[in-house]
A protein has these predicted regions:
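Nucleotide-sugar-dependent glycosyltransferase catalytic core
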Residues: 229-234
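Conserved catalytic core of nucleotide-sugar-dependent glycosyltransferases
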Residues: 46-189
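Short, conserved alpha-helix that lines the donor NDP-sugar binding/gating region
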Residues: 6-29
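Short helix/loop segment immediately N-terminal to the Walker
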Residues: 23-31, 175-199
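Short, Asp-centered acidic motifs that coordinate Mg2+ and/or phosphate
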Residues: 35, 104-106, 218
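A short beta-strand-loop structural module common to alpha/beta enzyme folds
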Residues: 1-4
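Catalytic donor-sugar/metal-binding loop of nucleotide-sugar-dependent glycosyltransferases
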Residues: 179, 190-200, 205-227
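Short beta-strand-to-loop acidic/aromatic patch adjacent to the donor-nucleotide binding site
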Residues: 24-44
Length: 234
């Protein structure tokens, strides 16, 4: 199945059907999943980059370690007792427990764009700064992103290497309204403060804008760089 409209093609990747309405679920709720990994066909990566992306979704504050104790035994295999009669124990290891409420819902790595200078992640600018920047958003550059040492939030991340947690497309707000209704990738008009500067944005930008408006943070890990195959791999 094929569509030349990128925004519609992305919806089709999630099994969408226009007849199911705005509250529909990816794959009609029939496919169990934990995360969606979006990969463009021109991205160059290995399994290490994939596992790094998974780790980026689980920040340190989401993880707790629970001690696992086991009885201490003597040479005869008998359980050693404490003075109070309880079993003596020793540390056998840890159980790692992840709080799903603290996982990052949308995470990405990054890649270089065809100009060889800018990257696939960007920050929003107000109208004055947008004009001063030549009518483009404040993209991280190769220089700026390489100075970053830990994950940071962005307003936009390209879909070439992006991980989305289950719930982003499924959740409802406190009023029972779908946070991210279908069509999930519909292009939108970006209108700045004066109303005189406006333009259509791409389907990935509009998804990110809608996700942020719905309360989801978008995290980029500067340590996860993947290749981008253009006239050369960058």
């Amino acid at each position: 199945d094929y569509s030349s409209m990128v925004n519609f093609a992305r919806c089709k990747c999630l099994g969408a059907n226009v007849l199911r309405g705005p509250d529909q679920l990816p794959w009609d709720g029939k496919l169990e999943y934990d995360w969606q990994l979006w990969i463009d066909s021109d991205i160059v990566f290995d399994t290490n980059k994939f596992y790094q992306l998974i780790l980026n979704s689980v920040p340190a504050e989401a993880v707790t370690k629970q001690q696992v104790l086991e009885p201490m035994k003597n040479e005869k295999g008998e359980v050693i007792k404490n003075k109070d009669g309880s079993d003596a124990t020793k540390l056998a290891g840890y159980n790692i427990v992840v709080d799903p409420e603290k996982e990052r819902p949308i995470v990405s790595g990054w890649y270089c764009t065809e100009d060889g200078r800018t990257t696939s992640v960007a920050h929003w600018l107000d109208e004055e700064d947008f004009a001063a920047n030549g009518g483009v958003m404040n993209h991280e550059t190769l220089d700026t992103i390489q100075k970053r040492k830990k994950p940071f939030t962005v307003d936009y991340a390209g879909f070439g290497w992006l991980l989305i947690k289950k719930g982003v497309f499924e959740d409802f707000d406190e009023n029972g309204k779908k946070k991210m209704p279908y069509p999930w990738f519909a292009p939108k008009m970006q209108v700045f403060e004066s109303g005189t500067v406006q333009d259509m944005c791409g389907e990935d930008v509009s998804f990110c804008l809608d996700a942020k408006e719905a309360g989801y943070e978008i995290w980029c890990d500067p340590r996860i760089r993947v290749g981008h195959e253009k006239t050369r791999i960058i």
